[in-house]
């Protein structure tokens, strides 16, 4: 028992290094890690036995051990001989503990690679000695640089297949060093090796006497990760408000930067409230000081409203606070990122609604050239400006990986669709304020004697939206209501005349109309909006511009065949003939509302009858 305790204590004091392996398909990443695990004697007897069996069943090395099978855990991976998901493995040597992430090489799994790289101290970039630098090598190296990994190993693998040729290695190393310099990666160690044969893997190989550097494991054991910057200003993202009883109120989280002591002056962001640290706890133990990386609980001298997601920071050097920011975004979803579309942005423990207001450029990760883009597709990287519904406290990613990184979440599926690194705040965001006005929307509604709201008619072209809205408008006007119609066709003659019918411009079309409708509701009007508005996200964006009782979604539902048969304007015929592109229902989707306030079956009634249903819903007696 004493020996076990001694071993555990020894493990506690060993330094930990997190690293990833990345590169192109079949460069040997899984084989390299599997061989390291084998050499480090970290495998149990049953794992070794399973490896022998699996090598015969799935292996690609004949009668020899297939080390890659230690990493390729998914059935699909073993059957295809590729890595799909990020595989994390732990091993240790006498000098150090390691957590290694084996990242997939296929281009469609670049998002998985970015996940593995987000917490890494170092990256091992594998290159097949027979092929040299490939597209995916450049892509992964760009992401390594983007995510701030400062230590990179170029592992030129499969040297056994080129006869351990020195010139081959040096040519590849020269090409990669030029790429690394272009990407701003300054610390690169180039190592020739054979993951299958074990050359220069755990120890130096006699087969390459011309190489005088360390083996891969020797380099990783000696590598010193970037130290935590204790001189940086203190920042604590609050993860939890700890209130076990009425006598204690603490704020818990992991210090993202600097150090904290009792008596330190702090500011709470984004509120800007100022206080002083009274007590500092590390776990249940009260301490005189805590440093970055430690989980702490702070108590403050003042009763301040602090919630999960707020940041407690040093008063003399706080993080920036902004509701508009610029950032590099790696898109990770099959559905493209579109400017104006709404997502959840999660920065630490803080969650706010956000949209990309502008894609300034897309980065060609193969050449690092900047290209014009109106959307980001899966695995693409763009430099974007984001607009947030509420201000957030952040530090640029180049200075702090914790307070400078975020993810984007789909508001319907809750899937992570993007990851980003913050660059800066947009300064004008903090200089624009609401001008207080004496006459508000309540006063304007009162003088008109009505409850303002927006009726948002949505449906396919030819469903009858405009006809129904027009009848409702006439009847409300006859009853003395103050109304206005915003019709999709009419608005495109003026306000939105610069917009086309691409997905991107459709999103902007609805954003503008929603803002105009909001102004009209503030003026006390009943606004009838008649737009196809095919995308659920944009209709949700419009809904969020209004109070809960101000927005009525009216789904004018009609089968596509019925709408196409009507075809009053001849648009369906032109779309079928290819004369019109991006036409809703033909080559552009319509996403039906899942829960509209009012569902009209336009094929089961006349426009007059359907208009009566709208008025009945509103509780209005028509003439």
Swiss-Prot record:
This is Bifunctional enzyme CysN/CysC. It comes from Xylella fastidiosa (strain 9a5c). CDD domains: APSK, CysN_ATPS, CysN_NodQ_II, CysN_NoDQ_III. Residues 157-160 are annotated as: G4. It is an enzyme of class 2 (transferase). It catalyses: sulfate + ATP + H(+) = adenosine 5'-phosphosulfate + diphosphate; adenosine 5'-phosphosulfate + ATP = 3'-phosphoadenylyl sulfate + ADP + H(+). Residues 1-450 are annotated as: Sulfate adenylyltransferase. Residues 14-228 form the tr-type G domain. InterPro entries: APS_kinase, CysN_GTP-bd, CysN_II, CysN_NoDQ_III, G_TR_CS, GTP-eEF1A_C, P-loop_NTPase, SO4_adenylTrfase_lsu. Residues 451-623 are annotated as: Adenylyl-sulfate kinase. In the C-terminal section; belongs to the APS kinase family. In the N-terminal section; belongs to the TRAFAC class translation factor GTPase superfamily. Classic translation factor GTPase family. CysN/NodQ subfamily. Pfam families: APS_kinase, GTP-eEF1A_C, GTP_EFTU. The keyword Oxidoreductase does not apply. Residues 102-105 are annotated as: G3. The lineage of its organism: Bacteria, Pseudomonadati, Pseudomonadota, Gammaproteobacteria, Lysobacterales. The keyword Nucleotidyltransferase applies. GTP binds at residues 23-30, 102-106, 157-160. Keywords: ATP-binding, GTP-binding, Kinase, Multifunctional enzyme, Nucleotide-binding, Nucleotidyltransferase, Transferase. Residues 81-85 are annotated as: G2. Pathway: Sulfur metabolism; hydrogen sulfide biosynthesis; sulfite from sulfate: step 1/3; Sulfur metabolism; hydrogen sulfide biosynthesis; sulfite from sulfate: step 2/3. GO terms for biological process: hydrogen sulfide biosynthetic process; sulfate assimilation. GO terms for molecular function: adenylylsulfate kinase activity; ATP binding; GTP binding; GTPase activity; sulfate adenylyltransferase (ATP) activity. Heterodimer composed of CysD, the smaller subunit, and CysNC. Signal peptide: none annotated.
